[in-house]
From Swiss-Prot:
InterPro entries per UniProt: TA_system_antitoxin, TTHA0281-like, TTHA1013/TTHA0281-like
Organism: Thermotoga maritima (strain ATCC 43589 / DSM 3109 / JCM 10099 / NBRC 100826 / MSB8)
One BP term from GO: regulation of DNA-templated transcription
Family of the protein in this entry: Belongs to the UPF0150 family.
Name this polypeptide is given: UPF0150 protein TM_1313
Amino acid sequence: MKNVRKIFTAIIEYDPEKKQYVGMVPDVPGVHTVGSSLEEVRRNLKEVLELVLEEAGDEINLQEFVALEMIEVET
């Protein structure tokens, strides 16, 4: 079976209270992690994503649509 390269959207935020980065891949349930740097959280996300996809095989339910939007409000 030939491997297929897929690209997923990751959301990474910085948590100033815990002084760490928090990352998630909204298309794939269960893919979230933390890291002390952007490089570490990216590496961790890739590792978790690969593990979840390998474990689930064809049974995973990927989201069909994920969007990032900028919403403007007055405060």
